[in-house]
């Protein structure tokens, strides 16, 4: 096996609520424009850590928001939903997940 054929190590960062992302970092991680992240905030899909800031440049997001944002953006893309519809569907899917978890926990 040559060096070029050698497997490369997988490097990653575990994102949780202790890690904070800027709006630019979140949009880059989601591979979308900042405007799409702003739309998710406006619809209440995701919320900045300190929501009082008016400018998106000042927003910071907990790392665990990344998964929710990606899921909402995937719903928008796959089903051609606007941000409001994606927020509704995402909320319903999360309720289903919670009900299934509660049922399994009995």
List each model region and its residues.
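Arg/Lys-rich, alpha-helical DNA-contact motif
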Residues: 2-24, 34-38, 42-106
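Residues within the alpha-helical elements of helix-turn-helix
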Residues: 29
């Amino acid at each position: 096996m040559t060096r070029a054929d050698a497997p490369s190590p997988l490097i990653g960062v575990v994102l949780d609520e202790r890690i904070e992302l800027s709006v630019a970092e979140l949009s880059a991680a989601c591979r979308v424009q900042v405007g799409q992240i702003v739309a998710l905030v406006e619809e209440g899909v995701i919320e900045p850590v300190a929501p009082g800031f008016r400018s998106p440049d000042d927003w910071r997001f907990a790392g665990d928001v990344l998964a929710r944002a990606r899921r909402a953006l995937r719903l928008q893309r796959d089903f051609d939903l606007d941000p409001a519809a994606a927020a509704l569907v995402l909320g319903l899917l999360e309720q289903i997940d919670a009900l299934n978890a509660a049922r399994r926990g009995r």
